[in-house]
Structures are given as structure tokens and as C-alpha cells.
Amino acid sequence: LEESVFDSTSTAYGFYPSPPEITFESVFQLFKDMAIHGDFVLVQQNVDWESFVLGVDGVSQKRTDIINQITLARQNNLDAVFVLDALNGLNRREFDGLPANWETSFANPDVRTAFKNYALWVVRNFQPRYLGLASEINTYMDAHPNDAQNFISLYNEIYALVKAEAPETQIFVTFQWDDLNNVFPQPEEGDRQRFSPNWEQVEAFEPNLDVWAISSYPYFVFQSGADIPTDYYSPLLERTSKPVAFAEGGFSTQAFAEFTHSPEDQVAYLNAIHVQLGPHMVFWVNTLLNDFNIDSYAKEMASQGRNPEDAQMLANFAYIGLREFDGTPKPALAVWESFR
């Protein structure tokens, strides 16, 4: 892109490119629609371990998928934020797609080599302004405290490599805020206080954290959007003078399972973020533009041999779009547009 949205001082708004249905038509239409309602696309792909362990350059389906996403984004004048994801997005306690005989640890030299090469490939091919090296890493650190330091050392190595080639790249990891803020009951983590964030997990990455980025899906915690405390997100700004970002998140608008939420709750959620973090955010991702058809996704996941529990978990996120499955706007879309 000739001019990057990230050159301006105002917040950039974006989405993760999950189409309402798993079809090519749905994908092409989504990129057109994201260009109307956003500035960038979140490119958050897992690691092609077997390809990247062999070197920075190479050809594989996963690499091609990323190239195609960026091509579509640029055709629609959308910028991109990259997050490289070693973990299973629906269960961040585990790696995603690691070859069967590989040790599941960030101490594994093959894991480290592949992840480094992936980062360098992205930097050299796409020159991203924002490069995330993990998503919701605190959930992995909680589950595997003995491996946390191995990941942090890998992060610092990649940070130095990328800065040597592209010093303007802003490098970060994301933290799952609702978990960091201790609003889920997790007795296995000891006597942590609700609304008292585990800052030590964030600060373990300093001084090499260029952005403090969070994800948040508070409908898992609060009965309504109005229940989000007025100081739920603002502690971030009291703790750091670094730029902050909302790297993914959403609020469900439909009653399902144990949830009883409505479109008004989604409006309250957007307003809470805007009021509490507002102009301090360099970018803000509402994970979905459109709700998605969970049957279409479950079928695709089954064909890939994914764990059926992953499809059930994914269903919890089906109604966080700013528009319904067919593109009908929800009340929150006008609120989102008013912020932009």
C-alpha cells in the first residue's frame, strides 16, 4: 500500500478474515465488506513447522494461504497486522499441528528454528508495521510455567533478528485480558485476586514489548455488557506508557448455551473499550465482521480431522460479528463506524 493507515496517529480498525461460510465467494465478499468497515485485516496463521524448519524460503500450502490473504487485502486497500501463532487458537494450552515426533516445548531447537524462520519470512515478504509473536500467551504460561522462560528467550532472539533487518517493525505478543485480570475462577493458579492483573506475565517481556496488546471476550464473564466495570480495561494505561492495542475480541449478541446476551450488550462492550482505552489504541480488532455459520465450519473442521471439541468451542464465538450471517447490520455496527 502506498499509504499505510498505521502512518496516522488515530486508531486503526480491523477484523479477522473469517467468512460467514467456508466458500470462495464468501471470502471475496468478506474482504470487500471489511474494506468498507475497517482499515486492516488481522493475519493470524499457525506455523508451517515442516516447511519453516527447513529454511526461511520455501513453497507450501500454508505459505500460499498467507500470500493469498495479503493479495486480497491489498486488492481491497486493506493493511495487515500479523500475529504468528504457535498454539491452538481454541485451546492455547497446546501447540498447533506440531509434527508427531517433535517435543512439545519452546526449548525444542526445531520449534525455535521454524518459528524464527517464519518470522523472518513474514518480515522479508510483507514488511508488516505490527508483528505479533504469540496470541494470548499468558494462557500458555499458566498451563506450562516451566516452558514460559523458553518462549520468552525465543521471543527476545526473534526481536533482535527482526529489529536488525526492519527496525521500524513494532513487535509484541498478546495477552488474554480476562484471564490476566483473574475474572475466571482458576483455583489451580493459587490465590489470585479478581481484577488484580498478573502484570509480571506482561513485564517478563520488557523491555522488548513495543505494544501492550490484549484480547478480551467478556461475555464469558459478565451477564450483560452493562456489567463490564468502568475501570475494566483502563488499568493498562496506568501500568504502561507504551502504545496499547485490542488485538482481538468481541461480545456475543445471541442467547445460546448458558449465554443470554443481546445486541445491546455488544454496544455496551464497544463503548466500554472506547471510553476506557479510546485514543490510546494503535489498533482495534473486532474478531468478526459477520457472524458465521457454525455448521459450515464444523463440516470443514471435520474434513481436516480436527478434534470435534474444537468445533464446539468455536460455536461460542459464532455471534460476535457486527453484522448477522447474511450481512444485516447489528446496532453495534453504527457505533463502530462512529468511532472510526
Located regions from the model:
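Aromatic-rich peripheral "rim/lid" segments of glycoside hydrolase catalytic domains that contact
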Residues: L1-A12, Y16, V27, F256-A268, ...
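Alpha-helical scaffolding within the catalytic cores
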Residues: I22-F31, T64-N68, F115-A119, N181-A204, ...
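Aromatic- and acid-rich polysaccharide-binding/catalytic face
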Residues: V41-Q45, F126-R129, L133-S135, V173-F175, ...
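Active-site clefts of carbohydrate-active enzymes
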Residues: N88-L90, T139, A143, V173-F184, ...
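Active-site groove signature of glycoside hydrolases
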Residues: K116-A148, F172-T174, W284
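Conserved, mostly hydrophobic/aromatic
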Residues: V122, L131, W212, E248, ...
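Active-site neighborhood of glycoside hydrolase catalytic domains
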Residues: A148-F175, N181-F184, W199-L209, P235-S241
